[in-house]
């Protein structure tokens, strides 16, 4: 079967199962690299380097760059890059399953060396990948990611807005979230059907709303936003009684998007000390975040 030329870029056919859309607009690439501002003294790691649109200009500014690439053909291509192969450490693995803590520990990095992560993430795994990376927030100085524009809106959202959801709360619990630039579909080959945007995530050194156990923050936000059209009295009924919510300063007629991160942290800490007898084990659905 012939492959459409629109799906082929620099001799490589984009694979739908990997969510591959290759960045090709040089002006956009320049702006992203400028936002990353790579420094030789940093430990830089790229997720999903693809055909090297960001890899090459970043590697030109530093002596070493580590990349994680699942596509074996692209990983092999990077290992034999004509002028950067000696700078690159290529890890051929799924970033969703990669233990960043074990890897960084194995390198015996200087305690003061900043770990900085960037990438043009496949949109089909971007949300679960960010949740995976949040587990290692204490190791990371910053992250720059190309994402679907709608996802960036959710990351940056404020309470009382439609975009505000569980992804918003968990991202802003761990990180300061800063939108960087918007990117049109024409900047990619093949062009995606959605607009894109670049976001900067800067993990807090000290969490502004610490919780005793993040499990309970996950649980309360999952319950609230999986039923976001319901009042909190009903959405959180398996976790709290109406009297308990009122005691914690929650308006029973409010909905999930009306609470701040501080409110959710307060609820999570109360649950940690007073776990419910029955907690419905609701599956976390990333496409509903």
From Swiss-Prot:
Entry keyword set: Cytoplasm, Methyltransferase, RNA-binding, rRNA processing, S-adenosyl-L-methionine, Transferase
Gene3D superfamilies: Ribosomal RNA adenine dimethylase-like, domain 2 (1.10.8.100), Vaccinia Virus protein VP39 (3.40.50.150)
EC numbers, comma separated: 2.1.1.182
SUPFAM superfamilies per the UniProt record, alphabetical: S-adenosyl-L-methionine-dependent methyltransferases
Protein location: Cytoplasm
Keyword Secreted: no
Reaction(s) this enzyme catalyzes, per UniProt: adenosine(1518)/adenosine(1519) in 16S rRNA + 4 S-adenosyl-L-methionine = N(6)-dimethyladenosine(1518)/N(6)-dimethyladenosine(1519) in 16S rRNA + 4 S-adenosyl-L-homocysteine + 4 H(+)
GO MF terms held by the record: 16S rRNA (adenine(1518)-N(6)/adenine(1519)-N(6))-dimethyltransferase activity; RNA binding
Keyword RNA-binding: yes
Alphabetical list of PROSITE patterns matching this protein: RRNA_A_DIMETH (PS01131), SAM_RNA_A_N6_MT (PS51689)
GO cellular component: cytosol
Binding site for S-adenosyl-L-methionine: 21, 23, 48, 69, 94, 120
Protein purpose: Specifically dimethylates two adjacent adenosines (A1518 and A1519) in the loop of a conserved hairpin near the 3'-end of 16S rRNA in the 30S particle. May play a critical role in biogenesis of 30S subunits.
Classification via NCBIfam families: ksgA (TIGR00755)
Recorded family membership: Belongs to the class I-like SAM-binding methyltransferase superfamily. rRNA adenine N(6)-methyltransferase family. RsmA subfamily.
Annotated protein name in UniProt: Ribosomal RNA small subunit methyltransferase A
Organism per entry: Haemophilus ducreyi (strain 35000HP / ATCC 700724)
């Amino acid at each position: 079967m012939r492959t459409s030329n629109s799906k082929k870029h620099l001799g490589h056919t984009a694979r739908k199962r990997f969510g591959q859309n290759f960045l090709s607009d040089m002006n956009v690439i320049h702006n992203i690299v400028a936002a990353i501002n790579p420094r030789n003294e940093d430990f830089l790691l790229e997720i999903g380097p693809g055909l090297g649109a960001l890899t090459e200009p970043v590697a030109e500014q530093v002596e070493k760059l580590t990349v994680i690439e699942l596509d074996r053909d692209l990983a092999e291509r990077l290992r034999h890059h004509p002028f950067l192969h000696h700078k690159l450490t290529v890890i051929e693995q799924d970033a969703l399953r990669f233990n960043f803590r074990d890897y960084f520990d194995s390198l015996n990095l200087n305690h003061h060396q900043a770990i900085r992560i960037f990438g043009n993430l496949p949109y089909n795994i971007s949300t679960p990948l960010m949740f995976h990376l949040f587990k290692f927030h204490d190791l990371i100085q910053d992250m720059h990611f190309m994402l679907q524009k709608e996802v960036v809106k959710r990351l940056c959202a404020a309470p009382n807005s439609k975009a505000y959801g569980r992804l918003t709360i968990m991202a802003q619990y761990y990180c300061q979230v800063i939108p960087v630039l918007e990117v049109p579909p024409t900047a990619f080959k093949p062009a995606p059907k959605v607009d894109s945007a670049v976001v900067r995530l800067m993990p807090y050194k000290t969490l502004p709303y610490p919780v005793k156990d993040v499990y309970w923050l996950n649980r309360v936000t999952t319950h609230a936003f999986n039923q976001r059209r319901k009042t909190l009295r009903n959405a959180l009924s398996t976790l709290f009684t109406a009297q308990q919510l009122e005691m914690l300063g929650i308006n029973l007629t409010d909905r999930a998007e009306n609470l701040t991160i501080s409110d959710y942290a307060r609820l999570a800490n109360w649950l940690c000390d007073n776990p419910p007898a029955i907690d419905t084990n609701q599956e976390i659905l990333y496409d509903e975040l």
